[in-house]
Amino acid sequence: MGWKTLDDMDLAGKVVLVRVDVNVPMEKGEVTDATRIEKIVPTVEDILKKGGKPVLLAHFGRPKGKVVDEMSLRLVLPALQKALPGTKVSFAPDCVGEEAEKAVAAMLEGEVLLLENTRFHAGEEKNDPELAAAMAKLGDVYVNDAFSAAHRAHSSTEGIARLLPSAAGRLMEAELKALDAALGQPERPVVAVVGGAKVSTKLDLLGNLVGRVDHLVIGGGMANTFLVAQGTEVGKSLAERDMAETAREIVAKAKAAGCTIHLPLDVVVAREFKAGAANETVEAGACPADAMILDAGPKTVAALSEVFASARTLIWNGPLGAFEIEPFDAATNAAALQVAQLTKAGQLISVAGGGDTVAALNKAGAAEGFSYISTAGGAFLEWMEGKELPGVAALNV
């Protein structure tokens, strides 16, 4: 791997600018889920142990280059302080300029400084070299620990990395290692599970995966579009009929690449989309005209369990059915629990990512069993699509 980690850096007495992701959900000015804040703690603590002074750079919300009080990182300070008990955490009202410089100069060893929202400056999202230089001026070393923002070429993720000695933080390092194990140099056979509502939003992803994995499992509303493309009737199910030709092209590309596509063999159908709705399981081609497909059936789950059992690596993005509503979470839950079991038994390396996916695996009680769960959202998807991530590429310099 062409990037450095904290282990490669001499940080003693140095000001370390750390790009973190603390873009957490808030309600009435209070953090409602501090997961992202907790995930940066190992990097911050490692820098402190090595005698460095961590200065945190982050964005919050979409202020579009203006100062918006409700998007001030000052609101995140109490949760950050709570995540670092016994460490003094200060706040600077800007991320560049005189106030930021004064705050950095006043730091003592063992202290942490959080700078104000980088997106309060219009240049941040334009990757303005002057803004990147003003940020770089504050520190001696740059560490990127925000894989979730690595698909954006911004001043604080890409521009600054070209101006200072740079390394990946612990969270970024774990993410890159997990992703390399899943798609970079994976143990074969490799299975990808791709679910969700629409083929149109995952075209690049499917196009990249068929050339890189041995098995592609398609679930959720997307599977209906592939069934339609085969000439199968899906009743009132969610399906993108205008994407049928595209779906056929993906199937042809998979065949040419030696990738087996797995579609539902049987489906759970209902007349209404609500919890506990009356439902029945039918063959994939037998969906009644007035019903909609809301989950994969038990035959499909049994077939998938054989595919999973023969695999060595699995990548998961998107649920197999309408997992938010019982009983249409059954296929997702059963498949996720089996993957977790195989992973715990040492038979499988499993990596999952994307908002719905993380929610579905948590709901199934399977998340803990996966090798790695990426909370990165867009960056995880772009990586699965085979795109170069600017924030990672800049660390290779």
UniProtKB/Swiss-Prot annotation:
GO terms for molecular function: ADP binding; ATP binding; phosphoglycerate kinase activity. The keyword Zinc does not apply. Pathway: Carbohydrate degradation; glycolysis; pyruvate from D-glyceraldehyde 3-phosphate: step 2/5. It is an enzyme of class 2 (transferase). It is found in: Cytoplasm. Its main location: cytoplasm. ATP binds at K202, E324, G354, G355, D356, T357. Monomer. Substrate binds at D21, V22, N23, R36, H59, F60, G61, R62, R119, R152. Its EC number is 2.7.2.3. HAMAP family: Phosphoglyc_kinase. It catalyses: (2R)-3-phosphoglycerate + ATP = (2R)-3-phospho-glyceroyl phosphate + ADP. Belongs to the phosphoglycerate kinase family. Keywords: ATP-binding, Cytoplasm, Glycolysis, Kinase, Nucleotide-binding, Transferase. GO terms for cellular component: cytosol. The keyword Cell cycle does not apply. This is Phosphoglycerate kinase. GO terms for biological process: gluconeogenesis; glycolytic process. It comes from the Bacteria.
